[in-house]
Amino acid sequence: MYTMTVAPGADVSGGFYSLKAAFAAMPEDPAVPVTIRVMPGIYHEKLSLTRPNVTIEGAGASPSDTVISFGDYGYEIMPDGIKRGTFRSYTFFVHAADVTLRNLTIENTAGDSKTHGQAIALYAECDRFVAEYCRILGHQDTLFTGPLP
């Protein structure tokens, strides 16, 4: 097993300042289980996890102590002039097998769906996925489990 630590500002010896940085440094061998321990704080990140066999756990006393937050939304106009759309509005996209999220809050802060459209907090298109003691927050289409039709 390979264990990593993420803390705001990387104030933990040998740790990472963001989940994206930790994802990039994971062992390439998918057979090696990885546990990422996330220290309390708010992480403003849009995440995509494609490596299997990963556990991400908040190190706080409750899920509200460790928050992964982003604010993309479906009606947002992209640089190419096209709306972002529902399925690109996620805060956290999991596209890998054998993933566990534990003791975390994952939120999409886009706001009112009448003006912003759909805004997915967690998009899980995977096998053997577990979200344990997690808070998943948003205003519309908060959780999406794929695949797309």
Q: Where are each of the predicted segments found?
A:
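Detector for repetitive beta-architecture
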Residues: 3, 33-35, 40, 46, ...
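Generic structural "secondary-structure junction" signal
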Residues: 49-51, 70, 124, 145
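Short acidic, gly/pro-rich beta-turn/loop elements at beta-sheet edges
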Residues: 46-48, 66, 78, 111, ...
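Right-handed parallel beta-helix
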Residues: 92-149
